[in-house]
């Protein structure tokens, strides 16, 4: 313990002397170097007990009392370098087989872990902590130097040997002691990786011995990297509790290391360093030149003071020889002398985490670069997926071993290794392109090596963590998460450019999932807007994320034109005034969870994505200020960072046409200095030309805009709000149109409860009175009263005017009360009452302020009658004890009624035909699809409805696939039935061919049918009866109906055009003035089976028209009969119809044995005159 120790300031008692005496005695009794053999350490008689006592002092005194006195004493006594490291060397050389020595070695490890535990400066430190922390930090650096460069042995390899027996035990057989030994071993490696020289303390010795390069080389030479690879590749199988410690070790090894330099060869690295040195020398020379311009001369070092006369006739004093150069320099010197005490914003004190700072770059030597690159490549090939999958799951379930800092370490380490994988692949492609021998061939599924962080679970975890860090203002965590998100996007972009189709499909799927959520878009915009002095690391991360996200999203939206995003908005629910809140409170509490889920479903909806609309969110002064703050570091930025800022300003000024946002004095001054100086960009850089052209175009646009808008000269001093931007861009203020409110839903009174208008008015009035809207009801009554008086005066004036009738004027419905005017639009029950009293709204638009009038069709008596009903309801008390609630009788007007009303209005409108050649067919389509008709179709529909109601609660509703399958089956059945039809009514190509014999036979049969029909009609006119049709004819007719061969008899529309042209050329046999009305007697050929839709009385009159009736031009509105009271049934037997008994005015068409009914004669009438005919 006499070797080098940490310096102690004498004369100051920082530790209790009794504590120091006890600790020193334990260290002395532990052992020491023998005088005979100075290189050999000799243990004391009770060394193991001494080590355990020292451990108890650390635990019971320092940890229990939250002090560092024992650790300070051990550092002063040089316990680590003077005793513990020699004991471990002794065990590794000669004592591994001794169980006693193994226990001593383990006891040494138990002391090394707490003594090398990293120290952090935090807000909960006591005075004792502040006193001892600097000394202990310096002591730990000495511990690390002794561990890494111990002369007589490899300490790290020795520590690993202590833990190897516990690693060899299967996980299921390990004891708590084995798990503790593994934990001690890994924590010791973690501590060695964390310890680094403190820049605020004076360094002792060579810093290279404790640098990152020395740590990496020691880990490689002493098999620590091999241990880490073995454990990382078996996490989850053999090592489940060590995942977080392994993550910490990796984080502290790779943090701050430049990935690009890591994968460079020696020649590239040498060229890179030469370029960096040249840039530094050039910066130095430029600074010297700038200084030489204003530097004092050798003989001009005496004081200089001048007076500067300003515009307001005031005089200012400026000192210094440099002010004599020119007036511009003088004014610049005056500006430099001004100071602005900017008010400091009180912020939450940020915790200093020097050990976890990953924004500070670290340089490593060539040997360490080679060793680290080998370890990184092997880790990517074997340990990446198992480790990060297991750590992510542990963080998500909040395991006990997970600390808050581990989330930041996880995301940063993932981002670093993803970037390493991309750079490795790029260098391998470059080597193959140059013809060099590749170190390793990339497998076709090589992206599977990092697939564990490209799944949906990682994206959800990342988005949730980013939102949590943003909400809680955790700057460091959010920076790590933004870096991780950026590297994931870049990796996916590289996957999309892969020659493998599988990689391209996976990349497209990942981009679809990332870009589908609009909350991700909004979060990135909010992060960029919210920058306020969070540091350069945060600034670099957020600008890089915005740049990569915008570029990839623009490319993806161009490839996927129909891209949709899911937007989630918080539902705006109006508070309802419910008087029965106490009664229904319990029910609402039970259903609250379901209602919340329903609300989430309602507010999540898809919409088409517009990239220009999204890019416009970055066109605001906050985002511009963020990138301006980033650009102010232009002297320290590399080419990629300068290009990032250039692309953003180019997008703002030229793509989005929002260059007005850049017209601010400090921004223009920054751009000018970047190009013209002082302190300009290096003109040899490739990015300089692009920046020069951009600045030239921006200043050119600004001058042009000043000529157009002189007000811009004043606005150059300030940031631009949206209204100012719009005015400067277009020359006028933005015209905003307030969105009109939607009218309330239409209401109606239950038709079954109120048959008449008076009953409906009573119900509505009672409900409005119950809802405390009596003032509105009285207003309607007053309007009716005044309208009745005015209408009475108008009617009396008409009576005195001598009989000349003028239309009654419409009376406007107005109100001086503003609340009443609003209620005319927003109160649905008032609108219902106004509709019931027959007020009408002018115009088609239902907007606030629409005019209502009393129509001219209402006379004074009707108005007074309506008012009397309202007054009667107001005087009658509302019965509260009624069995039914009147408010339940008012319901929302159903969409079916509205649709039916619209259909009724459009029923008589002829829109023409979309088919080629519009044949004017007044009675329907020329060729109907011939649906299958059923005599009991109505009954079948009723049974189906009842069956559905019964099965509604038992079976689930059919989904869209089942409905589509049923629809296809119905279509196939209809096509199969149509295929069986043999009728020549359907037009074929062969109809154009002429067959004279067939035409003659057709004309002969048609002439015979016309004569027979004319004879039957003539007999019916003379005798008033219809002759019986023969049984054979009836059976033939029914047989033809079943075969669908006489489809022409069921509808007049089924005749072909050729038949109609022939019938129109035939003349009438009798008197030209003979008008024969439609008869109820029909020939057997005219009785066909029609569809159920053709069974109404009107349909029968419209469809059952024979060829003779068309020829004689019958009028369907006239029916002939000699005696209307005589209905003589001639035959009513053999009626096998299954349908219901026909109505008196209809004929049973479904039965095969239709009964012939005597047609009652009727006088023929034309133009109101009775016409007698000789035919009678």
Swiss-Prot record:
One of its GO terms (molecular function) is DNA binding. GO terms for cellular component: replication fork protection complex. GO terms for biological process: DNA repair; DNA replication checkpoint signaling; meiotic cell cycle; replication fork arrest. This is Topoisomerase 1-associated factor 1. Residues 1045-1054 have a biased composition (Polar residues). Keywords: Cell cycle, DNA damage, DNA repair, DNA replication inhibitor, Meiosis, Nucleus. Residues 981-991 have a biased composition (Basic and acidic residues).
